[in-house]
Design a protein with these regions (language model features):
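C-terminal cap/substrate-recognition subdomain and adjoining C-terminal extension
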Residues: 66-218
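Alpha-helical substrate-recognition element adjacent to the catalytic core
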Residues: 1-101, 195-198, 212, 218
Length: 218
């Protein structure tokens, strides 16, 4: 998952607008605050629950390595976790390295090569609020686009945010049908979308002169 603004948003000072029922983490050193997207606590509990196969989470941010580790630590402290719920924590360093070797931004192939057999094109997807990270060829059948969690944006409605409810529903479908998903077929191939009955998330977008078919909660 991306951090800003997918699961959390960083603010140098406390947000003066509506934050009722939002989990937050305040940095005692500089007074900055991380606000967590509605439903994140419940999704964490779901992901680490008694689910077979297990749901593995990861962080991938455009921030630097220090920031990504800070967010990981903040999540552990805020939600009283004895150990990190994240299988990996990536930052802009991994993005730059991938671009140098001809990969795309937030390229899921990095994850699959780092954890061979554990993460595959049949069981892995990137959740991102930046459509360009899902439109490209490496992620278009292994990505899920969501609305930005942006408290500063007047168009964002805190009370209508169902992103984590959608993700939980999607993950349940994947887990339920995982035995029927071929190892050599991308998770969100058209056949898999039909098999898992998740067509309501299947969207068509025009990107330049191309029509892109991707999964999205928007």
């Amino acid at each position: 998952m991306l951090i800003d603004e997918t699961i959390a948003q960083y603010h140098k000072t406390p947000w003066k607008g509506e934050t009722t029922n939002l989990d937050s983490y305040r940095n005692s050193d500089d007074g900055s605050v991380l606000y967590f997207r509605p439903g994140f606590r419940q999704f964490l509990e779901f992901a680490k629950g008694p689910i077979e196969p297990n749901i593995a989470l990861g962080i991938w941010t455009y921030g630097n390595a220090a920031y990504s580790k800070y967010v990981e630590r903040a999540i552990c402290e805020k939600f009283n976790l004895d150990k990190s719920p994240f299988r990996f924590v990536y930052s802009v360093d991994e993005i730059r390295e991938d671009l140098r070797r001809g990969y795309e931004e937030k390229d899921v192939r990095r994850i699959m090569k780092t954890f061979p057999g554990e993460f595959t094109e049949a069981n892995t997807f990137l959740v991102d609020n930046r459509p360009a990270n899902v439109h490209h060829r490496a992620n278009c059948q292994n990505g899920f686009v969501i609305e930005s969690f942006d408290l500063r944006n007047p168009r964002y409605n805190l009370n209508n945010d169902r992103v984590f409810a959608d993700l939980q529903s999607l993950c349940k479908r994947i887990v339920k049908n995982h035995h029927q998903l071929p190892n050599n077929r991308p998770l969100f191939s058209k056949k898999n979308i039909k098999l898992m009955c998740v067509g309501k998330y299947h969207r068509k977008y025009k990107v330049g002169n191309e029509i892109k078919e991707i999964m999205s909660s928007e």
